[in-house]
Amino acid sequence: MAKDKDQNSIFAITKNLTITCFISGIIIAAVYYITSPVAAQKQVQIQNDTMRVLVNDADKFNKVNGKKDWYAAQKGNKTIAYVVPAESKGYGGAIELLVAVTPDGKVIDFSIVSHNETPGLGANASKDSFRGQFKDKKADALTVVKDKSNTKNIQAMTGATITSKAVTKGVKEAVEQVTTFTGGK
């Protein structure tokens, strides 16, 4: 008799656990279904805001046909920049960027979309003091150096050389892609 009671309690526990998991799964799926459109809309809003900050002269941003996640920044009917995604491997993993580049291949600015770099070191790559070095530079000048007297290239951040090189590599690749796409004009 004790054996039957133990088996019944095991089945009862299993049944209750299965029902609980099933109900939890339904609740999670319902919350995801309700919130995913809002999250997607918020992501688009963040990207649009970032593009406006990168190219504040633009009237509108149009998707570039044949290029995934590329946008042409338009002022009037003229393309004044391209906003291009880039990714590079930093000290803490992937660094995702949005890079604004002129049609003739000069960096306007960039924004770090996501990273896992060390706070206080690699995370400083998003600060104006580092980002400002990239302004108006073409691909050939996008090399990291540790010589403070060299203003032609990108000065590495102290304690974050790997991050400096990763961000510079990502920006350089974006510039090269735009230059290839436009023919440098």
Swiss-Prot record:
Location in or out of the cell: Cell membrane
Modified residues (FMN phosphoryl threonine): 161
Co-factor(s): FMN
Keywords from the UniProt entry: Cell membrane, Electron transport, Flavoprotein, FMN, Membrane, NAD, Phosphoprotein, Translocase, Transmembrane, Transmembrane helix, Transport
Transmembrane stretches, start-end: 14-34
UniProt-recorded Gene Ontology molecular function terms: electron transfer activity; FMN binding
A cellular component annotation (GO) from this entry: plasma membrane
UniProt membrane topology term: Single-pass membrane protein
Biological process, per Gene Ontology: electron transport chain
Listed EC numbers: 7.1.1.-
Task of the protein: Part of a membrane-bound complex that couples electron transfer with translocation of ions across the membrane. Couples electron transfer from reduced ferredoxin to NAD(+) with translocation of H(+) out of the cell. Essential for energy conservation during autotrophic growth. Contributes to ATP synthesis during heterotrophic growth.
UniProt similarity note: Belongs to the RnfG family.
Quaternary structure and interacting proteins, as annotated: The complex is composed of six subunits: RnfA, RnfB, RnfC, RnfD, RnfE and RnfG.
Stated name of the protein: Proton-translocating ferredoxin:NAD(+) oxidoreductase complex subunit G
Top-level taxonomy: Bacteria, Bacillati, Bacillota, Clostridia, Eubacteriales
Gene behind this protein: rnfG
